[in-house]
Each structure stands twice: as structure tokens, then as C-alpha cells.
Amino acid sequence: MREAVVAGALVVAGLNAVPSLVGGWVWYRGERADPGLARLFWLMLRVGQGSAVAFALAVGSLAAAGHTASESLFYLYALLPLAVAFVAEQLRVASAQTILDQRGLPDAAAVGQLPEQEQRVLVGAILKREVGVMSLSALVVVFLALRAAGTAHGF
């Protein structure tokens, strides 16, 4: 049983490492980044998040069936990625408002009143910040999943 839990944690780490690296590249390149790569980042990020949810459900099912880890830290590492993803999504939403506030715009509707070039610059800044936040969250999930794999004892 331990091998399956470790394998699951490693799959979660791998599925989150890829969007973390791709997102870091997209963030670094900014507006020069390939739009297809940016779309791929969001798809891979959601797959990574889904894997973390599936792993948490599997671990919860094992615990409900009486197969528990001997080290309670394992559960922290296995379940914390869900909280990280939730907080990251909130930060992603707040990052858009932060950019609007920096430019003195009250809401997203005000962006439509700007000239097209300014709209593009503003949207690019928002997307860059969102990608940065989410790729860092994926990196944190990688760390937590690797720690879960390292503490999966007693199954």
C-alpha cells in the first residue's frame, strides 16, 4: 500500500512540476511568450490541481478504510496542496484588481474605455502576474507532494 501512496504523491509532484516550469518561462517571457504555450500552461495547471484533489480523495478514502499513515505529518503534506490552490486562486483574482488599482481604474469595465494599445498592455500585465502566482503555487504543491511521498509510512 505504501508504494501506491508514494507513487501517487510522486505523480502529483510531476504533474505540478511541469506547469510550474512552463509558467515560470511564460512569466519570464511576458508578452513575448508564445500564446499557445500560455494556454498550455493553464491546461497543465488545472491537470496538476486535479491530481492533487484526486490524491487527497484517495488518501482520505484510505484513512476511512482504516489504512492510516504512522506519521501524521503525511496528512498535512497530502491535504495542504488543496489549501495552497485555493489561496493561489484568491491571489490570482486579487492580482487583477491590484493592477487596475495601480492604474487608477475602478473596475474591469473601465478597461474597455482605454485605447486598444493600453488595453493590451494592461491585460498583459494582469496575465503575467496571474501566471506568476499560479506557477509559484504549483511549485509549492511540488514541494508538499514530495514531502508527502517522504512521510508516507505505515500504510
Predicted stretch roles:
Residues 1-155:
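Polytopic transmembrane helical bundles with strong interfacial aromatic enrichment
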